[in-house]
Swiss-Prot record:
Organism field: Homo sapiens
UniProt KW Lipoprotein keyword: yes
Molecular functions per Gene Ontology: GDP binding; GTP binding; GTPase activity
Name of this protein: Ras-related protein Rab-42
Encoding gene per record: RAB42
Cellular component aspect of the GO annotation: plasma membrane
Record membrane topology: Lipid-anchor
Record-linked PANTHER family: DRAB11-RELATED
Record-stated family: Belongs to the small GTPase superfamily. Rab family.
Lipidation (S-geranylgeranyl cysteine): C216, C218
């Protein structure tokens, strides 16, 4: 999808334990944009962090560019991951509905971000991934909804395999960021990369060229 006409850039990170499906979730979302490549079927574990982008027309707001960071869940990469916290405005906290430990660790991930950013700068969304694996599920939707409510965030279940709610998760987070920005709960700040106002002079375009969603040099 072209980034032409985007008013803001929102920097968003996906956090959660290793192997919960963050990479496949992100690549599936990016590949849902017209002209974007298909996601790899078996992505390798993320090394540190990778950046992707997708432009999005908000339901009740302007067109925005999402800068999406896929972070590694392995402990040896945690120091790298933490460096992104202070410059994100949105976080998808992802757990695997078939892996109870990944669900129990959600509060740890949430606390890490809160300790770095504070309570007023980040919009969270809880994502229960791999909802297609009902036979091996060990975390109920009710449990997840209760945790999300206790942490003050919304909850969405997703499945890349069934193409279930992938777009909804990212779109819901983006809409919530825009609403917070409109209401003044989140403010543009010099030197903070969470939300950036995009000026037309910063996006040169040639009539014969198009920009597609995909990995970016962020």
């Amino acid at each position: 999808m072209e980034a032409e006409g985007c008013r803001y850039q929102f920097r968003v990170a996906l956090l959660g334990d290793a192997a919960v499906g963050k990479t496949s979730l992100l690549r599936s979302y990016v590949a849902g944009a017209p002209g974007a490549p298909e996601p790899e079927p078996e992505p390798e574990p993320t090394v540190g962090a990778e950046c992707y982008r997708r432009a999005l027309q908000l339901r009740a707001g302007p067109r925005v560019k999402l800068q999406l960071w896929d972070t590694a869940g392995h402990e040896r990469f945690r120091c790298i991951t933490r460096s992104f916290y202070r410059n994100v405005v949105g976080v998808l906290l992802v757990f695997d509905v078939t892996n109870r430990k990944s669900f129990e660790h959600i509060q740890d991930w949430h606390q890490e971000v809160m300790a770095t950013q504070g309570p007023d700068k980040v919009i969270f969304l809880l994502v229960g991934h791999k909802s297609d694996l009902q036979s091996t599920r060990c975390v109920s939707a009710q449990e997840a909804e209760e945790l999300a409510a206790s942490l003050g965030m919304a909850f969405v279940e997703t499945s890349v395999k069934n193409n279930c709610n992938v777009d909804l998760a990212f779109d819901t987070l983006a809409d919530a960021i825009q609403q917070a920005l409109q209401q003044g709960d989140i403010k543009l700040e010099e030197g903070w990369g969470g939300v950036r106002l995009i000026h037309k002079t910063q996006i040169p375009r040639s009539p014969s060229r198009k920009q597609h969603s995909g990995p970016c040099q962020c």
